[in-house]
Amino acid sequence: MQIILLEKVTNLGNLGDVVRVKDGFARNFLIPQRKARRATEAAIADFAVRRAELEKLAAEKLAAAEAVGTKLKDLVLEIGQKAGVDGRLFGSVTNHDIADALKAKGFTIEKSSVRMPTGPLKMVGDHPVAVAVHTDVVADITIRVVGEQA
């Protein structure tokens, strides 16, 4: 299916690009989230009229994301979890736990935006984690896992 991107999508394209994607990806993800539209002649003509408005909206989203990114930069977030004597956690700290802790601090971050390169955290200590606030803005934060006695 050919679609017009209404905003920048990671690994796919930028605003206004006409790209070919699998039907399910378009129908189940891109179109319902208003990230894309079917590339019909009417849609392409409508997009040409609305392009300036959409670019302005994208610039505003980017500016807001950069503001959140600067607040998040070098943030140290403490998360308590039950741990054994050797420092291993009973369970783990996942991206869901980190997103909940960030929401408690006043940030609106989705759990899918938390990128953990080494997977869930299973040890007590400081761990670097990347938070993708926007496709162009990634903030590095430190998660300090504090062990609580079981």
Curated annotation (Swiss-Prot):
<comment type="similarity">
    <text>Belongs to the bacterial ribosomal protein bL9 family.</text>
</comment>
<dbReference type="GO" id="GO:0019843">
    <property type="term" value="F:rRNA binding"/>
</dbReference>
<dbReference type="InterPro" id="IPR020594">
    <property type="entry name" value="Ribosomal_bL9_bac/chp"/>
</dbReference>
<dbReference type="InterPro" id="IPR036935">
    <property type="entry name" value="Ribosomal_bL9_N_sf"/>
</dbReference>
<keyword id="KW-0687">Ribonucleoprotein</keyword>
<keyword id="KW-0694">RNA-binding</keyword>
<dbReference type="InterPro" id="IPR000244">
    <property type="entry name" value="Ribosomal_bL9"/>
</dbReference>
<protein>
    <recommendedName>
        <fullName>Large ribosomal subunit protein bL9</fullName>
    </recommendedName>
</protein>
<dbReference type="InterPro" id="IPR020069">
    <property type="entry name" value="Ribosomal_bL9_C"/>
</dbReference>
<dbReference type="GO" id="GO:1990904">
    <property type="term" value="C:ribonucleoprotein complex"/>
</dbReference>
<dbReference type="InterPro" id="IPR020070">
    <property type="entry name" value="Ribosomal_bL9_N"/>
</dbReference>
<dbReference type="Pfam" id="PF01281">
    <property type="entry name" value="Ribosomal_L9_N"/>
</dbReference>
<dbReference type="GO" id="GO:0003735">
    <property type="term" value="F:structural constituent of ribosome"/>
</dbReference>
<keyword id="KW-0689">Ribosomal protein</keyword>
<dbReference type="GO" id="GO:0005840">
    <property type="term" value="C:ribosome"/>
</dbReference>
<keyword id="KW-0699">rRNA-binding</keyword>
<dbReference type="InterPro" id="IPR009027">
    <property type="entry name" value="Ribosomal_bL9/RNase_H1_N"/>
</dbReference>
<dbReference type="InterPro" id="IPR036791">
    <property type="entry name" value="Ribosomal_bL9_C_sf"/>
</dbReference>
<comment type="function">
    <text>Binds to the 23S rRNA.</text>
</comment>
<dbReference type="GO" id="GO:0006412">
    <property type="term" value="P:translation"/>
</dbReference>
<dbReference type="Pfam" id="PF03948">
    <property type="entry name" value="Ribosomal_L9_C"/>
</dbReference>
